[in-house]
């Protein structure tokens, strides 16, 4: 399935690129999310006439993500969880918990923006967490998991 990208998509291409993807990926994800349109002759022509508008929109989204990244620089959050005396949690701290903690601290964050490379945290301690705010913008924050018992 051939598509025209309306914004940068990680590991696929940039704004305006004509890409070929599997039909399910295009039909079920890229097109409904507004990230691409089918590469028909009419859509190619319409894209070229609105190219400046799409580029301006992409630049504003990137600028917003960069401003959010500066707010997260040096930020940390403490999350309390039930833990044993050895520091092993009776559960785990995952992306949803981290996103909720930052949102409660006044820094809105979606759980899909939290990247945990090695899975959820299962022990008490300090962790560096990568936030993927945009295809070109990532920042690192500190998450402290404490025992609340």
Curated annotation (Swiss-Prot):
Official protein name in the record: Large ribosomal subunit protein bL9
Record-linked InterPro entries: Ribosomal_bL9 (IPR000244), Ribosomal_bL9/RNase_H1_N (IPR009027), Ribosomal_bL9_bac/chp (IPR020594), Ribosomal_bL9_C (IPR020069), Ribosomal_bL9_C_sf (IPR036791), Ribosomal_bL9_N (IPR020070), Ribosomal_bL9_N_sf (IPR036935)
Pfam hit, one: Ribosomal_L9_N
Gene Ontology biological-process annotations: translation
Any one Gene Ontology cellular component term annotated for this protein: ribonucleoprotein complex
Purpose of the protein: Binds to the 23S rRNA.
Gene3D superfamilies: Ribosomal protein L9, C-terminal domain (3.10.430.100), Ribosomal protein L9, N-terminal domain (3.40.5.10)
Superkingdom field: Bacteria
PROSITE patterns the record matches: RIBOSOMAL_L9
Similarity annotation: Belongs to the bacterial ribosomal protein bL9 family.
Gene: rplI
Alphabetized UniProt keyword annotations: Ribonucleoprotein, Ribosomal protein, RNA-binding, rRNA-binding
MF annotations from Gene Ontology: rRNA binding; structural constituent of ribosome
């Amino acid at each position: 399935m051939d598509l025209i990208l309306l914004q940068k998509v990680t590991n696929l291409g940039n704004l305006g690129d004509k890409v070929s993807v599997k039909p399910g990926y295009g039909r079920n994800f890229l097109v409904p999310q507004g990230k691409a349109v089918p590469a028909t002759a009419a859509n190619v022509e319409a894209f070229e006439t609105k190219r400046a508008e799409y580029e301006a929109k992409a630049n504003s989204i990137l600028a917003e993500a960069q401003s959010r990244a500066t707010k997260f620089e040096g930020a940390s959050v403490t999350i309390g969880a039930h833990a044993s005396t050895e520091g092993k949690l009776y559960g785990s701290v995952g992306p949803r918990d981290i996103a909720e903690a930052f949102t409660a601290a006044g820094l809105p964050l979606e759980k899909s923006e939290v990247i945990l490379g090695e899975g959820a945290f299962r022990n008490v301690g300090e962790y560096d967490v990568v936030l993927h705010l945009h295809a070109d913008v990532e920042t690192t924050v500190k998450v402290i998991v404490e025992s609340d018992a």
